[in-house]
Design a protein with these regions (language model features):
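Conserved beta-alpha
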Residues: 1-119
């Protein structure tokens, strides 16, 4: 907004380094933007519980991931090809894209995701 007062300030609380595109779009739309990360994405302190869960994947009917960050961290630790017979549930299109980056996508895998964007 050249020469004018900005309408409002948007506070972006996404993890550090993950709000750049949104910040740019908001600034172009005339908003002041304050990036204020409230979540720090880091490796788990004790990988044993996740390793145990991965070792038991054959016992599960479904695995659900709650975010692209969860997918990236978990699958980096898993380090193997995801079993084709094990469906994966996710909450939004960003998570679907994260699964695809890790080679988990239809038709080889069943990915369960809502049709409407997550709130």
């Amino acid at each position: 907004m050249a020469g004018g007062t900005r309408a409002f300030t948007a506070v972006l609380t996404r993890p550090d380094g993950q709000s750049g595109a949104l910040a740019s779009q908001l600034a172009e739309a005339g908003c002041d933007v304050l990036e204020f990360p409230l979540i720090d994405i880091a490796p788990v302190d004790d990988p044993a519980p996740l390793d145990a869960a991965f070792a038991a994947l054959a016992d599960y009917a479904l695995v659900i991931f709650v975010s692209p960050n969860a997918i990236d961290r978990a699958l980096a630790q898993y380090g193997a090809i995801w079993p084709n017979a094990l469906p994966v549930g996710v909450v939004g299109p960003g998570s679907v894209a994260a699964l695809e980056r890790h080679g988990i996508a239809a038709p080889a895998h069943r990915v369960i995701a809502p049709q409407a964007p997550a709130d």
